[in-house]
Amino acid sequence: MKQTLLLITSFAMLLFNSGCKNQENKNAVPPALSDSEVSVYYFHFTNRCATCLAVEENSKKAVEELYPNEVKTGTYSFTSVNIDDKANKSLADRLGIGGQALVVVRNDKKIDLTSDGFLNAHDHAKLKELLK
């Protein structure tokens, strides 16, 4: 009985993990922000589910729609950060991030939007309102 339960649990975990998509971080992580810069960071692991990918896609789209001029000038940015990548560890440590997170940072002050961001991951309008 124990072996059957273990086998079923292992199979379920395998199915759950196979739904995640491997994706490399292609964005460079900037060092510290100046007084006028605002950055939205989406911290994630290498393996991500559909909701995780939706948070990134809709957050990035919202930032680009809300602040097009600021994005062009570099005073407002969206950065996807893979926290499994050791090169990003110092940024995650500096901001106190240990897992998946959606945060807005200005002058080393951060607003954590993780809970609401994941709750509204598939609702672009609500996520856009959060990032306003």
Please name every model-derived segment.
Residues A92-R106:
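Structural micro-motif
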Residues V104-K132:
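Non-catalytic, surface beta->alpha helical segment in thiol-disulfide oxidoreductase systems
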Residues K72-K86:
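Thiol-based oxidoreductase modules, predominantly thioredoxin-like and allied folds used
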Residues E64-G74:
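Signal peptide-proximal N-terminal region
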Residues S34-E65:
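Local sequence-structure signature of Cys/Sec-based thiol-disulfide redox active-site neighborhoods
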Residues M1-T4:
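Positively charged n-region of N-terminal signal peptides that target proteins for export
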Residues C20-Q23:
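Bacterial signal peptide processing site
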